[in-house]
């Protein structure tokens, strides 16, 4: 175990004495003995004479927090923070300090998880409902989801949504020439394996001949032009096609929104609503539709329902659309998206309100008008919002250089055209410097009136009541107090790795040298960032045993997708494009199957034994049956059942012998770092979750980073980007070349401060805590799966099915009751219905782990009282959970258990009390009566 003065000792919860006590309960004498019993010898890395795991010897020695921050400061200072007037979907913004301090820098917001337990997630669910309302209002459409990964993936999802809605009438999509290049590239990536043909044309001239299922255009366009798309929408509808418009939300405060001209879908980004550019991300994309397409929406959708007392309450709606349930038939492979950034954008809109946003938009447009007036006839377009396209025959390089000399980055379109984008941070001084670069004198602006919007927006009290900093601060505190995040309790969600997000790791993400970088800025502006990215890529290669890494995927789902595309392109490069069969064990997460379907593969399910292991005989039979068409096997390791399968090397060999590739899902890498490397025990490709293993916070449901790591033969097929020729030539999966680059310093700092010994100790401690919980709880809730030596990996599955059969108490009852004890529930009914999957991580102290075990044991005692007939199945502390303060002070308490039993089942001194803000929520009611925007205030009366 690390010395107590190191960062590793601050990150790892149990001290050496606690670890020894846990190992004693498990029945082993040391961490190394535990590793020997849990991790198969055939894949386990052997330590060097210096005690360092192979690969980890390539990491630098651990740094202190002070040293790591000093190194990061040096990398930051190597960057140049120029004035960005590049545009192309990314704009500088002024983040209100009240939002920076109370959301982005607040662990109550950034350490929360996806709101699967809605009763203890009401704060961020309300914030997300505000986001959905904001997007719906601004776009003029009825319903929006709770964020997308970025604008490009939102466009790709818009395409597939329109394709599904058309029910196969056509496989052709029309894309306007003035769509952002990165957006068009991602749409093309998604279209190719799905057999969708893209026709790119200047749609100002109308829809090309032939049948189309959909149309995608931009408002304003990449060139800055504002086009009235009403005629195109009407023409498309006449010919049976749907229309999706990529719309700038700030511009929509002035111009007619997509919904009001008949568009079916709107997509885009909310980045300029207070979220820094961050060298590409993270930012919350958005997707909005008419109500008749609500069930086709991808991703999370927050809806309003009722709780057990009939009060309004928020929850995730229509979850049967999603990948964890529908697998390869899901609407998308997206899990969570960008909740933390969606909250930032929604609160930015609340803070400014409709009037404030409109004033910002008018100021931005005014600066663009000033530039256009001075340029005169050189301006290409008559109608524009923030971006002026100038014709400068043969002078583009000269103008760009002149602006750069004045500290400003412009956008070179080609040798003859330069684009200038204004934003919230643009000043009169910036405008003057731009005019000097063009060599023109200021001129009196001629108003190019673009304000055609007449409809109201953001009229709900959520967008009118919080204009002062005091009001906003208190609103954010009120919302945060309704939730359980890591700042209040462990979150033992299996397969989620809710570990510490250390303050030292988080600090650099708001530094302007990282936060204010445009993703398409000149490379000379970002040497520090590029070195940081290179460091992180090299360290991940060393840790995983692969040969190359791409950091572009901005979610685990996108890492999966990128890895599968690399496999497809590899087979095609060898003259075997017909290889399209993807074998997936029945225990796998639904995202695997959804990603395979998006990559154009056919999913064949491989059975598992009763002990959770892959059925080798069934695997061999499926490999034989599909030998000539076998593309890949997707397998999670350790398995989704929470054990190390001892046959993993044999499984990989069987697939390789048939010409297939092995995709090792890296969701559970926290049980492997420093112990085994997937790139060395048979994997050809893995995605990693930096938001799990490497400490990027979950943010209530995003951001995330899902790098894809590959062996050398797949490296040429890693994601590329139209604006980053230095990357491989694969197909882009994210809008920015390096994805969510501004949060990469978090993982850099974690690895830099932990070092080889600390990383290995983290894995071993996570395994120790999981096995300790398994031992303590097994007699109360049987552990469903263990490995050959009776060990679990970093998580364990508790089987409640026999208990439910005997008593009627369900896994849902136990999950809700845990909130009364002050805990977030483990993962429910995954990967096996009627079970709880518990993952404590290495960061929780023995005191916290014991408190969780004590709560679970007490709950088992309550279950036994139900089973004995002391409490009715329909009226007991579990079925009544969670209990609000309001329900406890009612004068009509007629339950067979006491108020004290409801609120303080282990006494008032057990742990700080968490008061759930609502009772148990009626999910079916919410889906039957779908409401996905802010309800009227009267609903809460």
Curated annotation (Swiss-Prot):
Gene Ontology, cellular component aspect: cytosol; glycine cleavage complex
Enzyme nomenclature, EC number: 1.4.4.2
Modified sites of kind N6-(pyridoxal phosphate)lysine: 692
Keyword Oxidoreductase in annotation: yes
Catalytic activity: N(6)-[(R)-lipoyl]-L-lysyl-[glycine-cleavage complex H protein] + glycine + H(+) = N(6)-[(R)-S(8)-aminomethyldihydrolipoyl]-L-lysyl-[glycine-cleavage complex H protein] + CO2
Cofactor(s) for this UniProt protein: pyridoxal 5'-phosphate
Enzyme type, top EC level: oxidoreductase
Matches recorded under CDD domains: GDC-P
Presence of keyword Magnesium: no
GO terms for biological process, alphabetical: glycine decarboxylation via glycine cleavage system
One example GO MF annotation: glycine dehydrogenase (decarboxylating) activity
Keyword annotations: Oxidoreductase, Pyridoxal phosphate
A Pfam family reported for this protein in Swiss-Prot or TrEMBL: GcvP2_C
Family: Belongs to the GcvP family.
Task of the protein: The glycine cleavage system catalyzes the degradation of glycine. The P protein binds the alpha-amino group of glycine through its pyridoxal phosphate cofactor; CO(2) is released and the remaining methylamine moiety is then transferred to the lipoamide cofactor of the H protein.
Subunit structure: The glycine cleavage system is composed of four proteins: P, T, L and H.
Protein name: Glycine dehydrogenase (decarboxylating)
Organism of derivation: Mycobacterium avium (strain 104)
